[in-house]
Amino acid sequence: MSTALFLSPHLDDVAFSCGGTLARLKARGWKVALVTVFTRSVPQPTGFALACQTDKGIHPEVDYMAMRREEDRDFAALMEVDSLVWADLPEAPHRGYDSAAALFTPPREDDRIGAAVVERLAPLMNELRPDLVLAPQALGSHVDHVQVVRLLPSLGAWDSRVLWYRDTPYAVRQPEARPDPTLPGDLRPVVVDVSAELRRKVVGCTCYRTQVGFQFGGAQAVGPTLAAFHQREAAAHGRTGHAEVLLAGAGLDPALREALTDE
């Protein structure tokens, strides 16, 4: 059985960005691992870190990340994920990024999280030996996404097995956003028809109850927003229906492309 490892900076990124591809591979008999990097609960948060939960109506005494991990567990159950892994590392607001604007600046010189990410994920990669790795492009340049993208080569992920997904909803809000400049330069689009999986993707996204208000304007807006976005993505590549558009190197194994696109 083939294995796909979906690498998510935060507890929602894979669902929002490539949940349709996840559902498609699962329906085709693949084993799916969902690995999220920044998932740690930090006791008694203050300042901007605390504001990230109180501005969503969550009281200061509540363990915000525990709520989010429960949402991730709900998504994994719905999508029949085989392996759900949390790397238990702190999000950027707990690493000195003290404002919303700071989240979208280049990594700080004193932010040494990359080494910790490699330490947590390298053994997992060796254990799972995934046939396919899906990782973010870092559209929007959120520092946590950038850190994940830039450490990927240290995990031994080969170009022939990596697909980079379009970080959503950044791709919705910033359609001209470019991938992180450290990605390989010879990437080509892989257009995955997710028309049949779109409804399931939408339901999966609504599992992230603490996030859909901020990211989409409410649970009721998730479906229309994603339907319109994925229709535009398909049309931009001369297709009908709804598509998630990934990037792959020229050396992508043809069998992997066929599993995703039937081409």
Briefly describe each language-model feature range:
Residues 2-158:
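Active-site beta-strand->loop->alpha-helix modules in alpha/beta enzyme cores, enriched
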Residues 70-89, 97-103, 123, 127, ...:
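The feature marks non-catalytic terminal segments
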